Amino acid sequence: MEGSEDEEAEAGGPLQQLVKRQRREKRELQAKIQGMKNAVPKNDKKRRKQLAEEVAKLEAELEQKHKEELKQLKEAMPEQNKIDSIADGVANFELEGREQQIQHPRISKAQKRREKKAALEKEREERIAEAEIENLTGARHLESQKLASLLAARHLEIKQIPSDGHCMYRAIEDQLKDHHNSWTVATLRNQTAKYIHSHFDDFLPFLTNPNTGDMYSKEEFEKYCDDIANTAAWGGQLELRALSHILQTPIEVVQMDSPSIIVGEEYSGKPIILVYMRHAYGLGEHYNSVKLLTDATTENGS
């Protein structure tokens, strides 16, 4: 398989060759990591933690190397593409002229369909290659890598939560399962709305109309609480503060470039840990849950 892929890469342009080589290097690194995991006993927590940190470092180094390679190629490609396009155009013009002089062949409908299909396939491959560059250099990828490294140092990893407006509540619902608590998203929303509504004086000073900058009126406050309970309104720090009081549990929010935010520090016990991602989706901020890194390590090593 490797041989045929290399031959295919050689037939493509520089970008396709680079992307395919980088994919191969990723597979080779994953194979190496798997070997490292298999060499460490599952019950050796200290070495498992060291392994997790080393794996995160190896992956980050490879991603940085790939990013630099893609950046250099992207900077070098535009001028070369112009030269290639001109050369291809001249060659095609000369070839078509000779063919017309010789026999004036007719192109069948089937041939036109095949050519159109080939052109669409080429365009699709170019879009995929561009997406590969964006995935390796974009803010979303860099944020994911940084958060993965921060969590790996704590023997944790991101657990994906759907982006549907309920992400913060779904992430807390997921975390509560570890606390043997069966609260649903609907229950969490209803309790949050009730708590904020009953603590009007504590929350109102932090709620302002985005258009006027004025503090919410009583009607706006009522609508705000109703939206929490009955819509997919996105939850933020005020809702987290309310939930920490409702659950009497500290809630920690891990983020990329700032220290973790902890609400409900007055409560003891195991904190609920959420991951705040600014670039995860085009619509904006998103919350994910976390899980023990050993879950994935054990599965891969078994």
Swiss-Prot record:
It catalyses: Thiol-dependent hydrolysis of ester, thioester, amide, peptide and isopeptide bonds formed by the C-terminal Gly of ubiquitin (a 76-residue protein attached to proteins as an intracellular targeting signal). The active site is at residues 164, 167, 286. Residues 156-293 form the OTU domain. InterPro entries: OTU_dom (IPR003323), OTU_OTUD6 (IPR049772), Papain-like_cys_pep_sf (IPR038765), Peptidase_C85-like (IPR050704). One of its GO terms (biological process) is cell population proliferation. Residues 228-238 are annotated as: Variable-loop. Residues 161-167 are annotated as: Cys-loop. The keyword Acyltransferase does not apply. Residues 1-10 have a biased composition (Acidic residues). It comes from the Eukaryota. SUPFAM superfamilies: Cysteine proteinases (SSF54001). Its EC number is 3.4.19.12. GO terms for molecular function: cysteine-type deubiquitinase activity. GO terms for cellular component: eukaryotic translation initiation factor 4F complex. Keywords: Hydrolase, Protease, Thiol protease, Ubl conjugation pathway. Residues 1-52, 99-121 are annotated as: Disordered. It is an enzyme of class 3 (hydrolase). Residues 276-286 are annotated as: His-loop. Residues 106-116 have a biased composition (Basic residues). Deubiquitinating enzyme that may play a role in the ubiquitin-dependent regulation of different cellular processes. PANTHER family: DEUBIQUITINASE OTUD6B (PTHR12419:SF10), OTU DOMAIN CONTAINING PROTEIN (PTHR12419). This is Deubiquitinase OTUD6B. The gene is OTUD6B.
